[in-house]
Amino acid sequence: MKSNKNIMKKLSVFFALVILGSCASEHISNSDSAPEIQLNPESTIIGKTSDNGKTEAFLGIPFAQPPVGKLRWAPPEALNDVGHVFHAHHFAPACMQADRITRWYKNVVKGFGGDPEVVIKPAVSEDCLYLNIWRPSFEENKDKTYPVIVYIHGGSNKAGWSYEPNYIGHRMAEEKVIVISVAYRLGAFGFFSHPAFEYSNFGLMDLVESLRWINKNIDAIGGDASRITVMGESAGAGNIDYLMAIPSSKGLFSRAIHQSSGSAIRNQATREDHIPLGLKLSSELLGADGINVTQKLRDAEAEKVLAVSEKVYKGHYFDNAVDGKSVFETFTDTLKLEKLHPVDLLIGSNEHESLMYLDKTESVGNWLKNQLGIDNSDNLRKLLNVSSNKRDQLNVLATASGFTCPAINLAKGVAATRDQSWVYYFTRQRDGEMAESMGAYHGAELPYVFDTHDDWLPTSQVDRRLTKTMKNYWTNFAKTANPNGLYLPNWPRFTVNSSKILVMGNDISNALHPSLELCEYLESRFATP
């Protein structure tokens, strides 16, 4: 294991590069060796080759018109041209947000014994609809097309960016897939309901527009249009739920990788539910003046909108809402009616999703009453006998209700429509006393999938072996809709008749999910867990 000093040095350098990369792209002279994407006869995107020559990167490519001015709180408009020559060497600014994800990274670094002050927030802008592409070196494989993985970041739909340390895609691209990470409007800029505007789910529509751009330019990128996989974690996975359901995204992808989210099943909001907060934001920004509200809201400074929204929406989860324009029914209704798009699914959650977010003073009984509105019955107590530790019991409850049970329900729904489902349970805990206190936390699986340990995490040989295995599972799924492959432990398909899953920790095994009975109990108490 590396020393904390070396880890922190690498992390400092990495975040410095991230911040530098989020600045405006500088003009770098073209050369014969620079990789290119020829979008059309008039537009060329110039990227750069990785140090080992195995992959190419094209960073900060616009996929829609900037959502500013008249396009604030409007559906994204297609971008037809990136210019004659576009130098894609730097990441674009992140979408407007406070420092929530920066604080999250600080907490994780601190949890592993590092100095949280090395983590720096990236530049932000309302002009933020950009994507990044990592692909296998194209010069050696001009006649090949590759499966495409489109990654959607998390952050409660109010924070996060497409090039966080966990999401850099070059090592995954070495497995002969194309990795594309996309941005979308966040917070009140992306999920806003107000009578002055017809639509509510602007961030979701941004994701649809990014998929349209990718499909339109798939040949130039070198991708296979029949093998496009959307992949997301946390809120990113929650948005994938709606991408699997809404009409505008049908046919834009055929596979989905869904990591650690249950928001679309747990939250069933309508536009009307969110309008009161939208009106409050408008009132805080504009006062009592009700004249020309639409124009005045669009004219308000982005920084002021962000600052006011942080107060108005404090504690609010920015979920997609049924608005009759972009989302026509709740995701749960679409799932129950078996109306999801035909999509194969790889889905799962981590053992300690909720551990770092729990109130240490909360009792199991109070949590059940406050969060689920039920009492701590004898039947439930029996199901929680997995641990005598109160905090562990709370984690089992919160993780099951918030992540595991919704994932199992979605896997069942997809399996019922004869599409394929594959379910995992991630249990690996890093070595060391500090790591043990965090467990297999929310987001812990990401460095294994992307193979980004060296950027900021201490890594043992166990972690490296698991990384190779998980990266192969994920990329095999993108290639064939089946994660299994040569020399990999068998991953059983999840069906309506067989609930076997893959457990990924210190070892790989097949088992029934340890929270399966708890999920069945919760489902018996509620229409949806």
Locations of regions flagged by a protein language model:
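Hydrophobic h-region of N-terminal signal peptides that target proteins for export
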Residues: 17-24
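Non-catalytic accessory segments of hydrolases
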Residues: 24-200, 204, 457-470, 478-490, ...
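Active-site loop->helix "elbow" adjoining a glycine-rich segment at hydrolase catalytic centers
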Residues: 154, 206, 234-237
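Alpha/beta-hydrolase active-site loop
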Residues: 199-219, 276
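Substrate-access "cap/lid" subdomains that shape
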Residues: 216, 250, 259-368, 393-400, ...
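Alpha/beta-hydrolase fold nucleophile elbow
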Residues: 221-233
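Catalytic nucleophile serine of serine hydrolases
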Residues: 232-235, 260
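Short glycine-enriched nucleophile-adjacent loop
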Residues: 237-249
